[in-house]
Each structure stands twice: as C-alpha cells, then as structure tokens.
C-alpha cells in the first residue's frame, strides 16, 4: 500500500464518508459487542460506528501511523491498532468487520474475504465498499499520461481492476447465510479539474507520485490535470461532474 497523508485525504472528508454511511445503513445488526473498522484511515468511518453502537467496543485498524494519529485525536475512546491488514486477525470473533474503501488495495481477495468471514461470530456481518474506478478516466490517465515517466509509472504499486460482482457473490455465498451486493455511481460535483486532481492525490494517485522523483511531480501533475480537464468538461454552471463508481457487499455469517 502507498504512504498516506491524512490531511490530504481529509480535504474531502464529507464526500469520502458518504459511501461509508450508505454501507452502514445496510448492516443488519441491532446490537453489537465488538465492531472493527478495518482500514479505518483517519477515523471518519469509525465515528459512524461509534454513533450507531455507543456501548460497543470499537476497534480501528490501519497500516498507516499518520492516519492513526489523526484518528486518535478525533476519537480517543476508540481502541486503535496499527497492523498489516493482510495479516490482521481478532483475538476472538467479532460482531462486525467494516471495511470501507480499503480492500481494493489488498491482493488475493479469494483467500482474504472468506477468512474475514471466519473472524465473525454467528450472525456477525462483513461489510465492504470498494471504489470501482480502474477504467475511469481519472485512473486511466494516472497510468497513461505521456511523458518521460512512463516506464516508472508502469511499475507503480497501484490498485488492480476488481472482479465482477458475480465473482464476489460466488466467493462469499457458500460462507454466508445472507448476502447483498450492489453498485452505485456517485456523481460528485467538483469546482474544477484541479479539485479532481486534489481528490485523487489523497488516494489513487499516491502510488504514481511515489514512483516518481519529487522534482518530477509538478510536470506530471500538470500533464495529468490537462487530461482531467478534457475528460471531465465543465457543466452549465462551470463545475465538473466526477462520476465515482463503487461496489458494496454485506455478508451475514
């Protein structure tokens, strides 16, 4: 996974949290003793879990010390844990594993997702949301913006395209008593092309910037923004629509 910048990520905190709210709304769990926010980031999604289950033990897990620093400041009552998300396991079964916008960074879903289901108590819930934007212009341009950096961009540790929703259904259905999947495209309203670049600098663009020398960033970002400007033209009020598709799944063990 790339190195994270909590302040860059939080520039669009409300917009990033919207999908977490929509995912949480479909979690069929009235009472919970222990809930885990896996890939909690700076705690914006964790706050939703605290609000819904104020008496529960809430645990936030992330690989980034920078993200956890912000999370601890915002929610000191939560248990925070720095861990490799690929190897994390609870000491005992939990009621909810909530993974909002993190699993797309982790490999081998065929092994990882059934294993997460096994960490739930009977009746527990695994709730996952993943951006599905590998083929969107914003992400295609990250890989294809022409320049002297092309060879290094090809080796960036970026996300891979997600399998189809049907693949996830076939993977999880044998292990779940109830399974719901859906996809939504959020038509996010952005002020201009620069705002779209600022959005992706907090997430998907980070591996590509890390693959380049710092003195190459301005030229690459300028070329990338020119591509974004063409791919997302102004609407009638001058602002841009930034379609952002996401895949959701809620599995009950």
Curated annotation (Swiss-Prot):
UniProt name for this protein: Trans-aconitate 2-methyltransferase
Keyword annotations of the record: Cytoplasm, Methyltransferase, S-adenosyl-L-methionine, Transferase
Family recorded in the similarity comment: Belongs to the methyltransferase superfamily. Tam family.
Subcellular location: Cytoplasm
Gene label: tam
NCBIfam families the UniProt entry points to: PRK01683.1
Gene Ontology biological process terms from the UniProt entry: methylation
Catalytic activity as recorded in UniProt: trans-aconitate + S-adenosyl-L-methionine = (E)-3-(methoxycarbonyl)pent-2-enedioate + S-adenosyl-L-homocysteine
Molecular function as annotated in GO: trans-aconitate 2-methyltransferase activity
InterPro entries noted in UniProt: Methyltransf_25, SAM-dependent_MTases_sf, Trans-aconitate_MeTrfase, Trans_acon_MeTrfase_C
Function: Catalyzes the S-adenosylmethionine monomethyl esterification of trans-aconitate.
EC number: 2.1.1.144
Domain of life: Bacteria
Keyword hit for Chloroplast: no
Gene3D superfamilies named in the record: S-adenosyl-L-methionine-dependent methyltransferases, Vaccinia Virus protein VP39
Example of a GO cellular component annotation carried by this entry: cytoplasm
S-adenosyl-L-methionine among keywords: yes
Coiled coil: none
